[in-house]
Amino acid sequence: MPRVLVDCGNCGPDFNSIRQMVSSHFSAKVLQTHGADDTLKLLRERKVDLVTVNRKLDRDYTDGLDVVKRIKADPDVGNVPVMLLTNYEEHQQSAIAAGCERGFGKLAMGDPATCELLAPFLSE
């Protein structure tokens, strides 16, 4: 069964870029959510291998770290790995302190190092 990545808070073009990057390197399905509520709902409904959360959510510019904290605080799904998508190291450090795996920025989308970060979660 293919791995599943849930991408939260990205606009359509960025979501499609992430989906294309993932599908070109892994046999994984990429699903889109837009905020904490629909992400938590999806995490409760199916097995998810990784969640990526945009630093600033596309629809309302909510801080993605708030989504991360809600996921990590949930006793039913808090063990699902989460990455914050940001180009800024200080935000990566805040995310790691909140329980995230090291994420990546959109500027590094095509880098081999990004695939190396994703491989432990999306490789079969």
What is each of the regions a protein language model found here?
Residues 34-50, 56-58:
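Acidic, metal-coordinating helix/loop segments flanking the phosphotransfer/catalytic sites
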Residues 78-89:
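A short, hydrophobic beta-strand element within the central beta-sheet of small alpha/beta folds
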Residues 2-22, 51:
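Conserved acidic segment of CheY-like receiver
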Residues 113-124:
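Receiver (REC) domain switch/output surface
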Residues 63, 87-108:
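Alpha4 helix (beta4-alpha4-beta5 surface) of REC/receiver domains from two-component response regulators
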Residues 44-46, 72-78, 98:
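Conserved phosphotransfer cores of two-component systems
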Residues 52-71:
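Conserved phosphotransfer microenvironments
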Residues 27-35:
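Short hydrophobic/Thr-rich beta-strand motif most characteristic of the beta2 strand and flanking loop
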